[in-house]
Amino acid sequence: MAKKPYGEVTKDIVHIADVDLDGHKPIYVELRKVVGVNWMFAHAVCAALGIDKWRKIGSLSDEELEKLEDALRNPWKYGIPSWLYNRRRDPETGKDLHLVGNDYKITMEFDIKREMQINSWRGYRHREGLPVRGQRTRSHHRKGRTVGVIKKK
């Protein structure tokens, strides 16, 4: 099966959402390098904008790149369903949000600090450096130096 021609790659490096992306790779693959964008959301953005996900990201025009970045930051404008967002029912506003880049990192950091301040179980597990989501700790999640076995005399 022959590949479809998508025109020349005009840009070697594309800058979207504070991340430098390789212009010679497909949109679908490169969007996942942006913090806060998973493969499902990348697929939804490509479908909402009507762009083929296997098209090289360097072949997009400046207008298309602006639309792509706007769709990452404001997905509700493009009809992307809210169940794909990475921050549903925000505690401060109560709205469904989608955060990308440093906004995502900072917000997650504040959420963990808030959990620790209110002394919730999740906050306690974070504070103690233990697994938060119910994993077992008998054999894994041990930190520090190992103490060897001492032979009986």
From Swiss-Prot:
Has UniProt tagged this entry with the keyword Zinc-finger? Answer: no
Enumerate the residue ranges of region (Disordered). 132-153
Any one GO cellular component localisation term in the record: cytosol
Keyword annotations for this protein, in alphabetical order, are: Ribonucleoprotein, Ribosomal protein, RNA-binding, rRNA-binding
Q: State where composition is biased (Basic residues).
A: 135-153
Q: Which domain of life is it from?
A: Archaea
Q: Which InterPro entries match?
A: Rbsml_uS13_C (IPR027437), Ribosomal_uS13 (IPR001892), Ribosomal_uS13-like_H2TH (IPR010979), Ribosomal_uS13_archaeal (IPR019977), Ribosomal_uS13_CS (IPR018269)
Signal found in the keyword field: no
Q: Which GO terms describe its biological process?
A: translation
Q: Which GO terms describe its molecular function?
A: rRNA binding; structural constituent of ribosome
The cross-references to Pfam families, in alphabetical order and at most eight, read:
Ribosomal_S13 (PF00416)
- Family that this chain belongs to: Belongs to the universal ribosomal protein uS13 family.
Binding partners and assembly: Part of the 30S ribosomal subunit. Forms a loose heterodimer with protein S19. Forms two bridges to the 50S subunit in the 70S ribosome.
Per its database record, what is this protein's job? Answer: Located at the top of the head of the 30S subunit, it contacts several helices of the 16S rRNA. In the 70S ribosome it contacts the 23S rRNA (bridge B1a) and protein L5 of the 50S subunit (bridge B1b), connecting the 2 subunits; these bridges are implicated in subunit movement.
Q: What is this protein called?
A: Small ribosomal subunit protein uS13
**Provenance organism:** Nanoarchaeum equitans (strain Kin4-M)
